[in-house]
Amino acid sequence: MRWGCHLPRTSWGSGLGRTVPLPDELRIQSSWPFKGVHHPLRPPRAFIRHHGNSADSAPPPGRHGQLFRSISATEAIQRHRRNLTEWFSRLPREERQFGPTFALDTVHVDPVIRESTPDDLLRPSTELATGHQRTQAELPPLALSQLFDPDACGRRVQTVVLYGTVGTGKSTLVRKMVLDWCYGRLPAFELLIPFSCEDLSSLGSTPASLCQLVTQRYTPLKEVLPLMNAAGSRLLFVLHGLERLNLDFRLAGTGLCSDPEEPGAPAAIMVNLLRKYMLPEASILVTTRPSAIGRIPSKYVGRYGEICGFSDTNLQKLYFQLRLNQPDCGYGAGGTGVSVTPAQRDNLIQMLSRNLEGHHQIAAACFLPSYCWLVCATLHFLHAPTSAGQTLTSIYTSFLRLNFNGETLDSTDPSNLSLMSYAARTMGKLAYEGVSSRKTYFSEEDVRGCLEAGIKTEEEFQLLQIFRRDALRFFLAPCVEPGHLGTFVFTVPAMQEYLAALYIVLGLRKTALQRVGKEVFEFVGRVGEDVSLVLGIVAKLLPLRILPLLFNLLKVVPRVFGRMVSKSREAVAQAMVLEMFREEDYYNDDVLDQMGASILGVEGPRRHPDEPPEDEVFELFPMFMSGLLSAHNRAVLAQLGCPIKNLDALENAQAIKKKLGKMGRQVLPPSELLDHLFFHYEFQNQRFSAEVLGSLRQLNLAGVRMTPLKCTVVASVLGSGRHPLDEVNLASCQLDPAGLHTLMPVLLRARKLGLQLNNLGPEACRDLRDLLLHDQCQITTLRLSNNPLTAAGVGVLMDGLAGNTSVTHLSLLHTDLGDEGLELLAAQLDRNKQLQELNVAYNGAGDTVALALAKAARKHPSLELLHLYFNELSSEGRQVLRDLGGSGEGGARVVASLTEGTAVSEYWSVILSEVQRNLNSWDPVRVQRHLKLLLRDLEDSRGATLNPWRKAQLLRVESEVKTLLEQLGGSGH
């Protein structure tokens, strides 16, 4: 997978909020939880705003005209509205992650709907070519309120068919339309009755009248059923998902029936409704996939509308603004307080908007509203994880569930093949071939080769045509990047890696030898027992030496095939592990940063100059493969018709563990180590992780930006381990107190803990105090240098040190302690009895407090070394400290300068290496001043000694100091 300047292509699944926007008019339907408060967003063009809220207001009383004026009818309609509101307001778990106030009628952006004609429907499918753009150029757009307007000839429109490919938002559009009616926003209809064609098809041929179908689903409407005939066009039936229902409009197949109380097959009832033979004045809205449009003869349809998604970038931006600006979006799981601030949300939206403007490929992806949902869910996952156990793989699996759950490729086909299963076999093959050959751009021949592979019958060809019309655009998009025009790419890069992993774990990848071996194995399995029995009898009767050999061969065949399959699994595991630990990319970020960069438009990992420009990196492929083996994702995939057998999952996991055990023992760069941990996080199997990571002794994540998600990943994978970690290095990780709190189970296992350069303030010291006081704490070395702890923080920290029995080395270098902090340390140092080394250098302390701390250190029972260099010490103060440290009374040695009398301090290299390491982060003017003072000490000591060996040592150290000064001077200081 390459994460770089091109971005994933993004849109969202089976339904996300949308508005009916036109190129010259945008319509926003929004209602907020607080009455009278309008959302501040303003699209660049005029729009109409509607108000209402399902969260805290009951549906308004309907305007029933002359039809439903009776009290009983009015109450029945009101109960019906309330029931529909409750039912259609329920959101799947995947939507609830965006905050408790998120609701479909709170913020909604309708997709573009464009009117089409029967002639357009008869044109050959252009598959992935720019068919949508052609439609947009030729046909006018429609608003929801215009669907039943008279046609161009002035004729009344009674039946409207809306069609769109998978992911364009048909389901959400229907839900939003029903909720609009419930809140009085569709005054043209006094009664709305929605039907799910999936529900109707489940009834089979069981006879039921239209009245029974209505009352079984909407009990309150019993009161108004007698009035349906008189309702006319003010009665609206909504038939959602026509592709699920087999309709036969032939008179020989479905007889005429005009009585709503006459029982019949549900499909026959719908046919007579659509024929306008039953309730001829009623209005009907039908939604369907493109392949099923022809099931209704065009003479029964007054208007066709194509749902075209978010063809305008402004709609995409508006969707992201409304979705990501939810007030309750971004709070951590379990009340941990981790949240995305309004400023951070605004920054995300601005970066995403700039990316949409600058990179046409992500805009092409966001053409489908479902992929807009995926982008929002991914950003939410990366920046504000909300639920324990949520993984990147589960987001993609849920995304497919939202779009494909229960979807069959063709309801008329007896095989009842699931649409997702067909996609896994065809698109998964293309995706895996791309990963294997390291490419993301595919020619038309590549696509056709994977789609048409193995097709032999007319039925298989028909299924392929349905898939092309209904779902191909969901997975593939024309590439609009310069230099790759005429090729196709997966809608988002990560989808290629997900499908490739799915193709593997489903066992769809088989070599020719495996296919032949499987057939032989199945044949032997069918006849093996009988043949073995016959051979056994014959061998006893006739002295034929060949028969025992044949008998043994029959036993060997299953074992040979099993080994062949096992070798194939090991080969895949080997390729996956090698992909995960590739280091070819220069400045390779971890996969989470790569994914965020690709969505937000931040430049991704730079390539090494000698690397071929076409080389692709697919580091998410192993992550998805691991995630798909988790129990949760396997359960969801089974719902989609893609079951992964438990035995297959176990054997795949064993093969992966075998390879990881070998590769995982090597020392990895920090970003690669985080990828390794993320692999285990995706798997969600603590036993597997404990066995593979049992040999891990050093956790070096220095320089990795530890977001809340990454802290959760590390804590989840390593928090339950039992063996100690020799060193945990979290230097320069942008850690905050919340991150420290999350990582507490891991920090308790550390012996050496490095938290340098993390901008940790006094509030972080409370977590550090709790860490030090924990009865399982085994930290011996704690490095907190270059953090603004201040005197307030060190006071809290001393409370932890007072009760701690493990820490022997503590570094508080450059922690803004000042005189107050060192004075506090001097007063409370005796509360700890185990400390052996204390570094409080570069803290702005003066002579008095430095001397007081040095005296306290000399009295400490265990302290051996105290670092005080680079403080605001005078020449006299440094001399007093040198004299104190050089006295023969025992106690801690005090290091305040590069010299000890007329000799070089044995700690001179420690001091200068610390300066060199922090040269870019410390104040250059202040460092330069301190180095000049140290240089003066060296020169004075050199002038005061006659020992040539000491002079040579002093000259060498002077040279090192001058080199550092030149580096600072070369930087303009």
UniProtKB/Swiss-Prot annotation:
Homohexamer. Interacts with MAVS. Interacts with TUFM. Participates in antiviral signaling. Acts as a negative regulator of MAVS-mediated antiviral responses, through the inhibition of the virus-induced RLH (RIG-like helicase)-MAVS interaction. Instead, promotes autophagy by interacting with TUFM and subsequently recruiting the autophagy-related proteins ATG5 and ATG12. Also regulates MAVS-dependent NLRP3 inflammasome activation to attenuate apoptosis. Has no inhibitory function on NF-kappa-B signaling pathway, but enhances NF-kappa-B and JUN N-terminal kinase dependent signaling through the production of reactive oxygen species. LRR repeats lie at residues 693-716, 722-745, 747-775, 776-799, 809-832, 833-855, 856-875, 876-897. It comes from the Eukaryota. Residues 554-972 are annotated as: Required for the repression of MAVS-induced interferon signaling. Keywords: ATP-binding, Host-virus interaction, Immunity, Innate immunity, Leucine-rich repeat, Membrane, Mitochondrion, Mitochondrion outer membrane, Nucleotide-binding, Repeat, Transit peptide. The LRRCT domain mediates homodimerization and LRRNT mediates trimerization of the dimers. Residues 1-84 form a transit peptide. Residues 665-692 form the LRRNT domain. Residues 904-968 form the LRRCT domain. InterPro entries: Leu-rich_rpt (IPR001611), LRR_dom_sf (IPR032675), NACHT_NTPase (IPR007111), NLR (IPR051261), NLRX1_C (IPR048900), P-loop_NTPase (IPR027417). PROSITE patterns: NACHT. Disulfide bonds: none annotated. ATP binds at residues 164-171. This is NLR family member X1.
